């Protein structure tokens, strides 16, 4: 693909709301300050990151976007959390509508020279955590920063869905034909009290797999797990923790 995934997709679907997979980094310097960047397309401040390309994994995307937008390199990355809530939805100045499926990492600067790219970032600065409140930072970035500062297990929001949801596959497939596109979803491990793991046998292939399904526009990924578990198994589940992120 000679153009970026998001440009390719928008050429086909227009400005309609779609899921976009993002990777973002909460970057710290040697003084434990957090990097903020002022975007060129909005007036707010946020953190470096961008859209996952086809055939790219989450960590590679996070490192690439960080380097492209800031000129900086990051060492080892820790998973902060998964941010997919429809209350984080964005409409860009050009009218493009997005439901985020954002994987957030945190790490420390290990090299490079800080320089805004002038394309997505017009200014950058490292700030102590206590000074962040005075900057216009969207809710989703504030949640990521708060989760990074808290530490602990990777974060996710409780199951939530809007009153009306929409199938993401049928929202995109008619416009792209048989071409590959990024469809987001969840696979989950359901265990009994005795530690046994639930597996499902696929009717067509006969292979065994854990319950899994695509997210719907208008729900977060925890709600996807609850909904798909009910549909595929009849069970009600309570999502407990993130095991990993895979692309």
Pin down the residues of each PLM region.
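Hydrophobic, helix-prone linear segments
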Residues: 1-88, 94, 139-141, 187, ...
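Residue-level preference for beta-strand/loop junctions
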Residues: 19, 97-101, 180-182, 206
């Amino acid at each position: 693909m000679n153009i970026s995934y998001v440009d390719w997709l928008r050429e086909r679907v227009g400005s309609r709301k779609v899921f976009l997979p993002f990777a973002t980094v909460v970057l710290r310097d040697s003084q434990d300050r957090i990097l903020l960047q002022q975007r060129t397309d909005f007036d707010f401040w946020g953190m470096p990151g961008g859209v996952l390309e086809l055939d790219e994994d989450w960590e590679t995307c996070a490192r690439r976007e960080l380097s492209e937008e800031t000129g900086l390199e990051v060492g080892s990355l820790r998973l902060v959390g998964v941010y997919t809530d429809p209350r984080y939805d964005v409409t860009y100045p050009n009218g493009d509508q997005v439901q985020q499926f954002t994987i957030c990492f945190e790490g420390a600067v290990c090299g490079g020279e800080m320089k805004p790219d002038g394309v997505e970032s017009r200014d950058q600065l490292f700030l102590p955590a206590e000074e962040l409140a005075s900057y216009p930072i969207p809710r989703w970035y504030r949640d990521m920063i708060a989760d990074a500062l808290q530490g602990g297990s990777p974060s996710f929001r409780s199951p939530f869905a809007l009153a009306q949801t929409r199938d993401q596959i049928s929202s995109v497939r008619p416009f792209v034909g048989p071409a590959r596109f990024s469809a987001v979803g969840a696979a989950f491990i359901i265990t009994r009290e005795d530690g046994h793991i639930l597996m499902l046998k696929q009717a067509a292939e006969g292979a065994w797999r854990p319950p899994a399904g695509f997210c719907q526009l208008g729900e977060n990924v925890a709600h996807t797990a609850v909904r798909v578990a009910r549909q595929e198994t009849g069970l009600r589940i309570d999502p407990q923790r993130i095991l990993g992120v895979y692309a």
